[in-house]
């Protein structure tokens, strides 16, 4: 017990000096530039990982020393910390995680808990969201390229837990059901505290962090079945997400460059500054109608450049073997292959 208490106090003392994020130690004053939910971690680049296929996926933190295996570090240092992303988001154990990370960065005993990033297998970034809310037509040029009216308020649809997929994973194309497969790079909001009818001015304080996602779509099912957006977008594995979630204090969500590449060719290139509904408005608007819970995620819309927006004679739909790479500034590059 004394050993545990010493470690907790030591972690608390160094926490003010640094937090691990993106491989760089960030002064606490910088980490506090953006608001974040009480009970949520801050100043961190988070991921879900495992060291081999026989293990369960668990929480990791990207640091300048490598990927910190949180469960391993907690055991070595005898300090409590949430072991999964879902535990972190739904149980408000962020301060405990920050203490563990700060302690591990300076404690020799924690050295075995740091591993090289290339040796880990990424898992689904968030695995148990109660809701996956998606915003459609949220970039003016994308609405125009698809022949849709520019919406006055966010257009909402949903995906399901079975859609979630991981970085460096595969998306199995249901070729018996559809033929017109398309990409959509998007910024994803991860909710950090319960949000119901929240004012727009406070909305960012409900975001735990942000990630890179792809709202993968079967266009023929979306448009040629009477406008069944859900069927075209909610097929299993159609929501790749990752590799990281940056905590909200480290990100200006309305000023991030985003791109999508197919087999190395850039197809989409824009900025979240071009979103019609900004991050505050989306969170506030959705919360008027749907109570958001910690761990829920929001796909925020895609910019122009999708296959659906091209002239019909130039629409070359995605096929097995294609490799997709989606990147958002600061949030990392999400990669997956079609099979």
What are these regions (language model features)?
Residues 1-3:
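Secretory targeting signals
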Residues 5, 12, 28-154, 323:
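N-terminal non-catalytic cap/leader segment that marks the start of a structured domain
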Residues 5-21:
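N-terminal export leaders
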Residues 34-37, 47-49, 122-124, 144-147, ...:
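A generic local secondary-structure boundary/capping motif
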Residues 61-66, 191-193, 263-264, 328-330:
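Short acidic-glycine loop/turn motifs at beta-strand connectors
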Residues 148-167, 183, 320-329:
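Structural signature of FAD isoalloxazine-binding scaffolds in flavoprotein oxidoreductases
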